Amino acid sequence: MNEYTDTIVAQATPPGRGGVGIIRVSGPKAKEVALAVAGRELKTRYAEYLPFKNEDGSALDQGIALFFKGPNSFTGEDVLELQGHGGPVLMDMMIRRILKLEGIRPARPGEFSERAFMNDKLDLAQAEAIADLIDASSEEAAKSAFRSLQGAFSTKVNELVEAVIHLRIYVEAAIDFPEEEIDFLSDGKVSNDLHGIIDNLEAVRREANQGSIIREGMKVVIAGRPNAGKSSLLNALSGKDSAIVTDIAGTTRDVLREHIHIDGMPLHIIDTAGLREASNEVERIGIERAWEEIQQADRVLFMVDGTTTNDTDPKDIWPDFIERLPESMGLTVIRNKVELTGEAAGICHVNNPPLIRLSARTGEGIDSLREHLKDCMGFSGTTEGGFMARRRHLEALEQAAQHLEIGKEQLEGFMAGEILAEELRLAQQHLSEITGEFTSDDLLGRIFTSFCIGK
């Protein structure tokens, strides 16, 4: 158990007015704070309604006090929670009262969760899940984050780590005891176990990718010439009149944003100004901002007015626009206004990039676009039993997979046990980064400072 010499305090509830405000204290002097503020020693894990006292003995507030004796607390230390009225002035008065006591300081962002991690009350993936649960923007995200907090992700990672460790032991035994008559590397066990680990890791990666999509979402930019129907498409996808729609070209001058969910997948939709030669300074700024958003998009919906051209290849429709796009940019061509052209709505899988015919005005073909966007992100829509994952988790899983593949190649091609053992060690190291078993102090600092103060 990690020992901290100082005691920290912070408001655990959001700042602002509220019916209830909670102040959390953690550290070796939490019991002294309880004695000073409550005026008496508190029973462990027992809610007591009493006045909260100032240093002169007068009452500042009244409410519920809870004391948790370490290590049986969230942080693993002595913890005091004071639940009073949630006025911002009152909360500030209470915290200033506590800070006057010797050895108490304000908590850093995420420091309560950091202490819980350092005291082995939860691992790093679970600690991150606390922040993800608080920030969840949908029911699916909240459920996935809670499953991660309960250890669903960590359990899968730990199972992989254990499997890698056992295989390392077997391989290194073969290297260290070459005089044994059994050829450990060629008896099939190592190869079978390695393939099993690789398959299990790939399954975890697929689940983690779904969890990352639920957390991060997809940034989709609608771009094209003026009056192609971009704002109408934004309204159709969001289900409300987010953007003004007129027959006047250039109505949209600035970037418009909407956040929606498709079967639990967050979608950040951005409508941009029509791209053309600017006729004035305001339009020029709008077009510049449009290109800034396009450069940062996960996918661009290239909006085309179907009544102006029969072409379906974007290079034929607008070569200058396509040439300016990043090579790796995901692109979908949207032929709008099928209600006027008479074309059948839906997706055409023959084209590259994909082509979707729809009517942003009537909504025909919008469901095909929604399904297409899910497919583009590899989102299955099945979140039952899944967990939340972050970008760093995906990177660690990818690194581990790469090392296992290298080890497999060395084993199958050269029977190189020493190299396989090293690749297994590196794979184990990357997997352990997810739960914090092997993590740099710098990474821990970046993770916990992104938390709320009081968490």
From Swiss-Prot:
Quote the subcellular location field of this record.
Cytoplasm
Q: Where does K(+) bind?
A: 227, 246, 248, 251
Q: Where is the TrmE-type G domain?
A: 217-378
Q: What is this protein called?
A: tRNA modification GTPase MnmE
Q: Which PANTHER family match?
A: TRNA MODIFICATION GTPASE GTPBP3, TRNA MODIFICATION GTPASE GTPBP3, MITOCHONDRIAL
Q: How does it assemble?
A: Homodimer. Heterotetramer of two MnmE and two MnmG subunits.
Query: What is one process in the GO biological process aspect for this record?
Result: tRNA wobble uridine modification
Q: Which organism is it from?
A: Photobacterium profundum (strain SS9)
The GO terms this record gives for MF are: GTP binding; GTPase activity; metal ion binding
Q: Which residues bind GTP?
A: 227-232, 246-252, 271-274, 359-361
Cofactor(s) recorded for this entry are: K(+)
Gene that encodes the chain: mnmE
Binding positions ((6S)-5-formyl-5,6,7,8-tetrahydrofolate):
24, 81, 121, 455
What family does the Swiss-Prot or TrEMBL record give for this protein?
A: Belongs to the TRAFAC class TrmE-Era-EngA-EngB-Septin-like GTPase superfamily. TrmE GTPase family.
